[in-house]
Regions:
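Short, glycine/acidic-enriched loop or turn micro-motifs at the edges of active sites
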Residues: 68, 107, 124
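Structural motif at the C-terminus of the N-lobe alphaC helix and the adjacent alphaC-beta4 loop
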Residues: 37-48
Length: 157
């Protein structure tokens, strides 16, 4: 989906609009219900995430707590990502893997705020070693050929 910063009655919030683009390598069912199910699953595990504040099922929108700060990707680009971020990611993996889960480890999905690494997406999938942090995600959490290629492809080099 697409996420937008908006002003709620008590301050900033994030509004996520579900979208339905075709995806050749992944089959989605009901994306809104999947997002809600994943939120409940990850919340039950205790993953630090923004709270879900509201759901508009008719418009397929989620309203989430705003988590301030730069994403891990932005911190990688400026050289300001502290080592504790990757240590916290590995601690999250110790919660996820025994539960049979992976999340989207791409660094745009994480914000280090108040010393805590927050997963700002709600997506999770059944565990598959080829997509876990060590085999896939960590390739994008440092100055690697994969990250440089992604940045160039997205005009962020």
């Amino acid at each position: 989906g697409y996420s937008y910063l908006a002003q709620g009655s008590e301050g900033p919030v994030v509004v996520k609009q579900i979208h339905h683009e075709p995806c050749s390598y992944y089959q989605f069912g009901d994306k809104l219900q999947s997002e809600l199910r994943d939120y409940r699953t990850l919340s039950a595990l205790g993953l630090p995430m923004p709270r879900l504040l509201a759901v508009d099922e008719a418009q397929e929108r989620l309203v989430k707590q705003y988590t301030p700060g730069p994403t891990v990707l932005e911190q990688l680009q400026t050289g300001t990502l502290p080592p504790q971020a990757e240590e916290q990611m590995r601690a999250l993996c110790r919660l996820l893997y025994p539960a049979g889960l992976n999340i989207d480890y791409f660094p745009t999905n994480f914000i280090l705020w108040g010393g805590v690494l927050y997963y700002v997406d709600y997506e999770c999938n059944p565990y598959d070693a080829q997509w876990d942090f060590s085999h896939w995600g960590s390739r994008y959490w440092a100055d690697t050929p994969e990250l440089r290629a992604w940045l160039q492809e997205h005009g962020q080099n």
